[in-house]
Curated annotation (Swiss-Prot):
Disulfide bonds: none annotated. Homotetramer; dimer of dimers. Residues 102-112 are annotated as: Flexible loop. Belongs to the AdoMet synthase family. ATP binds at H18, D178, G179, K180, K249, F250, D258, R264, K265, A281, K285. K(+) binds at E46. This is S-adenosylmethionine synthase. GO terms for biological process: one-carbon metabolic process; S-adenosylmethionine biosynthetic process. Pfam families: S-AdoMet_synt_C, S-AdoMet_synt_M, S-AdoMet_synt_N. Keywords: ATP-binding, Cytoplasm, Magnesium, Metal-binding, Nucleotide-binding, One-carbon metabolism, Potassium, Transferase. PROSITE patterns: ADOMET_SYNTHASE_1, ADOMET_SYNTHASE_2. Transmembrane segments: none annotated.
């Protein structure tokens, strides 16, 4: 149901140099390397980083070969960690690899779905593939922004991307890779009306003046640059509270400051807390894992539903049983913004989208090395890269199915 009255909503993002995001990037870079030579590779790779060390573990079944230590070092160096003075050095860090094969008990349910094994469905390629696990996945879309994402997370990601851009391009050469952003938006009912607070915490070189150098630079080169790019004239940006490194100096960062793990930024990866989350992480998982592929499909469904004018704000949930091809549940929430009966919207979604795992992989062309680019700055609503689940190619068909 839509809400009325003024309220504040906050979302955060992190840069690619955040310890958890280093891990996501390593896991997805390994995945991409394996998918390049073996599109049917089964991959579940987890990474841990800490002071001077990278540990890679998981389960992989593939005919491909990947030089994992080299991928680890190249990824760390590309992010910008090339010196112990920055908290990590991809040239000299220790790399430990512990990879096993996927459980054959899991594989049998993915390779031969419950429906095929019981004779419930025919043995074609789509029917044959069962879900790689049980679970529930959510998708969300809203008219907040042109890319149909919640504004707080959209702005937070843009700020994090810009923070990395000015560091890597040399505009602000004293910045270091680790950083976080946070955006608080005032809503009047369901409409974003004012940018209230921006927090930017960024690692930097020693002896940088916070008040006279860092804060003015970030206000102009990061916040000012991002605000100049967004096309939202109705958003009040006249009185923004900017908080830069509120704890003071931030020299000790990266894995030297905090250990990092794959899959620990799932709210940053999705909708910034404005939508529910099923709990499954994305990075390091091939698309047979519905944690990833079905969450992408649900974003595709939700975005097409809003683009079709079925609702201004929509959240969709799908659920699976391990080894079964067909979803066990579909739920649609329109928050009182629907333009037709929600039951009709749900039926239109069912008619327009095939949510069996094999069909999702086919329709979104997911057996490709496209995942490392998603490891930082969000998996949804990206304006800087082209992702198949951001397409609104089913909007007209969905609108017709809903009778609009």
């Amino acid at each position: 149901m839509s809400q009325s009255g003024s309220r504040l909503f906050t979302s955060e993002s992190v840069t690619e140099g955040h310890p958890d995001k280093i891990c996501d990037a390593i896991s997805d870079s390994i995945l991409d390397a394996l998918l390049t030579d073996d599109p049917r590779a089964r991959v579940a790779v987890e990474t841990l980083v800490t002071t001077g060390q990278v540990h890679v573990a998981g389960e992989v079944t593939t005919s491909a070969y990947a030089d994992i230590p080299k991928i680890v070092r190249d990824t760390v160096l590309e992010i910008g960690y090339d010196s112990s003075a920055k908290g990590f050095d991809g040239n000299s860090c220790g790399v430990n690899v512990a990879i096993g094969a996927q459980s054959p008990e899991i594989a049998q349910g993915v390779d031969h779905s419950h429906e095929v094994r019981t004779g419930e469905l025919s043995d074609d390629e789509i029917d044959r593939q069962g879900a790689g696990d049980q679970g529930l996945m959510f998708g969300f879309a809203t008219t907040d922004t042109p890319e149909l994402m919640p504004l707080p997370i959209a702005l937070a990601h843009r700020l994090s991307r810009r923070l990395t851009e000015v560091r890597k391009s040399g505009v602000l050469p004293y910045l270091r890779p680790d950083g976080k952003t946070q955006v608080t938006i005032e809503y009047d009912g369901d409409k974003a009306v004012r940018l209230d607070t921006v927090v930017i915490s960024t690692q930097h070189a020693a002896d940088i003046d916070l008040d006279n150098l860092l804060t003015p630079d970030l206000r102009e080169k990061v916040l000012g640059s991002v605000l100049a790019e967004i096309d939202m004239p109705e958003l009040d940006v006249s009185d923004i509270r900017l908080l830069v490194n509120p704890t003071g100096k931030f020299v000790l960062g990266g894995p030297m400051g905090d250990a990092g793990l794959t899959g620990r930024k799932i709210i940053v990866d999705t909708y910034g807390g404005m939508a529910r989350h099923g709990g499954g992480a994305f990075s390091g998982k091939d698309p047979s894992k519905v944690d990833r592929s079905a969450a992408y499909a649900m974003r595709w469904v939700a975005k097409n539903a809003v683009a079709a004018g079925l609702a201004d704000r929509i959240e969709v949930q799908v659920a699976y049983a391990i080894g079964k091809a067909a979803p066990v549940g579909l739920f649609v929430e329109t928050f009182g913004t629907e333009k037709t009966d929600p039951a009709r919207i749900q039926q239109a979604i069912t008619e327009t989208f095939d949510l069996r795992p094999g069909a999702i992989i086919r329709d979104l062309d997911l057996l490709r090395p496209i995942y490392a680019q998603t490891a930082a700055y969000g998996h949804f609503g990206r304006t800087d890269i082209d992702l198949p689940w951001e397409s609104i190619d089913r909007a007209e068909k969905l609108r017709a199915a809903a009778g609009l």
